[in-house]
Amino acid sequence: MILVVGLGNIGVEYENTRHNVGFMLIDLLLKESNFTNLTNSKFKGELFKIGSSLLLLKPSTYMNNSGLSVKAVNDFYKCERMIVIHDDIDINLGALRFKKGGSSGGHNGLKSIDTLCGNDYERVRIGVGKGENVISHVLGKFKPEEEITLSKVLEHTKKALLELIENDDLSAISSKYSLKA
């Protein structure tokens, strides 16, 4: 079983914020797939299954406690592989990077996952840039002119993710799909 986690915060006030690009990508995947809804309170998030071996998770624990949801799903399904999609303020909007393991880079959602599940998982890092105030920047909504770039990046990321799921070759996917901005 492969677990793909899209990080974000629940609630209308967080929709379309920079911190929610992980949720946005999961929503894009669901829009174009036949899925089974496995959401259950024990998973502390929205959980969906595509085919026989792909799980998509949107934790409902808020960003700083994402690891609680990821651990609950991982413990129940014994996933062999995990891919986490998240915003990254250290790369510009329009950029896309791939990584396996390493530090959380100060991202509280990753920090929570690392603490509860370890850090040996693949990461899809979607650039959102860095504002003057980090918290208000990541919790802020995209500007209309940024939404055009975001839409293109999410579509590109979806293709990369689907290929990564099939091929399990992060290095090749990184070479083929990484974007600079």
From Swiss-Prot:
The active site is at 19 (proton acceptor). The record marks 87 as: Stabilizes the basic form of H active site to accept a proton. Hydrolyzes ribosome-free peptidyl-tRNAs (with 1 or more amino acids incorporated), which drop off the ribosome during protein synthesis, or as a result of ribosome stalling. Catalyzes the release of premature peptidyl moieties from peptidyl-tRNA molecules trapped in stalled 50S ribosomal subunits, and thus maintains levels of free tRNAs and 50S ribosomes. One of its GO terms (cellular component) is cytoplasm. Pfam families: Pept_tRNA_hydro. Belongs to the PTH family. The gene is pth. It catalyses: an N-acyl-L-alpha-aminoacyl-tRNA + H2O = an N-acyl-L-amino acid + a tRNA + H(+). NCBIfam families: pth (TIGR00447). It is found in: Cytoplasm. InterPro entries: Pept_tRNA_hydro, Pept_tRNA_hydro_CS, Pept_tRNA_hydro_sf. Monomer. The record marks 9 as: Discriminates between blocked and unblocked aminoacyl-tRNA. GO terms for molecular function: peptidyl-tRNA hydrolase activity; tRNA binding. GO terms for biological process: protein quality control for misfolded or incompletely synthesized proteins; rescue of stalled ribosome. TRNA binds at residues 14, 62, 64, 108. Its EC number is 3.1.1.29. This is Peptidyl-tRNA hydrolase. Keywords: Cytoplasm, Hydrolase, RNA-binding, tRNA-binding.
